[in-house]
Amino acid sequence: PTVALGNRILVGQLPPDSGASADAIVVLGRGKDLRKSRAEVAAKLWKTGRAPKIFVSGREDSPVIMKLLTAGGIPQQYLNSENCSQTTEENARFTAILLQPKRIQRILLITDPAHMLRALLTFQRMGFTVIPYLSPLPLEYTAPKEAVLVFREYMGLANYSLAGRLSRQEKGP
């Protein structure tokens, strides 16, 4: 019950999905257990025309998610990635460096429910207009695993807030 409440509080701060289109879908890595779900959500959004491109961010995860997207029928020319980032802040900064020069501003951001609030605020800080889109946790995810994610996000939000990583920047990375 405590984990569910903690997660509901994090998700309750998010704007609902408006169904609007975006310039790109941005998929954040977050470990091997969450790759398949994120790839499936990104492929679904792309196939329904929500955005013309998919960008994957994350050192360990992006190569695997890119393969899953290709295997799921997304042509390579609509895919791009960076595999240097190791934190949410680096995800946002490196994504901004690569996408904003291409005039990509409005993004559909894909991550898990617990991570979304910090990711949304961090990407907004880098100048993106963000449409949050949640990827579900795998069914086999246990309550203790989910509790770790939720606790980690509360600590991450506190850390980013105290370090000034959630306040608006002037523009870009």
Which ranges hold each PLM region?
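The feature marks non-catalytic terminal segments
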Residues: 166-173
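A structural signal for short, hydrophobic/glycine-enriched beta-strand patches
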Residues: 1-152, 161
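Acidic, metal-coordinating catalytic segment for phosphate/diphosphate chemistry
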Residues: 158
